[in-house]
A protein has these predicted regions:
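Short, small/polar-rich loop/turn modules that mediate ligand/substrate recognition or access, typified
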Residues: 173, 178, 248-250
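Short C-terminal tail/terminal secondary-structure segment
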Residues: 6, 146, 238, 249-264
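Active-site helix of classical SDR
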Residues: 121, 157, 165
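Alpha-helical segment proximal to the catalytic Tyr-Lys
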Residues: 126, 170-171, 246
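Substrate-binding pocket helix/loop in short-chain dehydrogenase/reductase
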Residues: 97-98, 102-110, 218
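Residue(s) in the substrate-gating loop at a strand-loop-helix junction
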Residues: 141
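Conserved glycine-rich cofactor-binding loop
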Residues: 9, 16-17
């Protein structure tokens, strides 16, 4: 299916690995010129070369920056003053007890997971409205609506993104600009795969068997009993960026493998 995104420009934050990289790849597959973001210049450059080799008709660019830093954010704006698509994927997480989350941790998570995304959106949204086309996607989590209690500082920020997206969507009334949120469930990132391999390092099992054993022991509520693959989220994001998804406005879209047991 042609998503009709050829020659659009997209900034995908945190796009050198995991979900962000998968989204960047799937957008490039649709002919989008992707700005690859990360703090490590070598990783950014490597990802740009990888995408360029896979999709030679696109022009991926390096957007190396720590987007929590206002100065680096402003430098990025000067270099890339307009994008058609903004995917606010960058974020941090760590399992922590409530007792260990001090004010400094709260502040770090708020600045990284919320304020950076808000700052990018505040800069790029006016141009999208002026051109009567734009897509903003915030990456949240099923933890936004079903907090596990294992990382309250993370869950809070992801819930805030749902509210932010819904609020900002009101500004797009009558335009072809959309602002939505994707809530992925447990996803097979490089780090997750490494953890699973380590847990079952002494077992004579295929990775698929290790994955099923881990899910049964730790995430029995998952209805798919496997980790979501980043490419699945990438394809969903590409669709949401397309003209075919113009009726999604302020929507929190769950791709959680059935983790959340409620209808809403």
């Amino acid at each position: 299916m042609d998503m009709e995104l050829n020659n659009k420009t997209a900034l995908v934050t945190g796009s050198t690995k995991g979900i962000g990289k998968a989204i960047a790849i799937e957008l490039a597959r649709e002919g989008v010129h992707v700005l690859i973001n990360g703090r490590n210049e070598e990783e950014v450059e490597r990802t740009v070369h990888e995408i360029k080799s896979k999709f030679p008709n696109t022009s991926p660019q390096m957007a190396t920056a720590d987007l929590v830093d206002i100065g680096q954010r402003e430098a990025l704006f000067e270099k890339y003053p307009h994008v058609d698509i903004l995917v606010n994927n960058m974020g941090i997480y760590e399992i922590m007890t409530y007792e260990d989350v001090d004010d400094e941790v709260w502040d770090t998570y708020f600045r990284t997971n919320v304020l950076a995304a808000n700052g990018l959106t505040k800069f790029y949204l006016p141009g999208m409205l002026k051109n009567d086309f734009g897509r903003v996607i915030f990456m949240a989590s099923e933890e936004a609506v079903m907090p596990s209690g294992q990382m309250p500082q993370y869950c809070m920020t992801k819930s805030m993104l749902l509210s932010l997206a819904k609020s900002l969507s009101k500004l797009t009334r009558g335009t072809e600009v959309t602002i939505n949120t994707i809530m992925p469930g447990p996803t097979l990132s490089e780090n997750v795969q490494h953890i699973i391999e380590g847990i079952y390092a002494n077992e004579d099992m295929t990775f698929s068997e290790k994955e099923k054993a881990f899910m049964a022991a730790n995430l029995p509520q998952s209805e798919i009993q496997r980790f979501i693959r980043p490419i699945e989220i990438g394809r969903l994001a590409a669709f949401l960026c397309s003209p075919y998804a113009s009726a999604f406005k302020g929507s929190p879209i769950r791709m959680d493998g059935g983790m959340v047991p409620t209808i809403f």
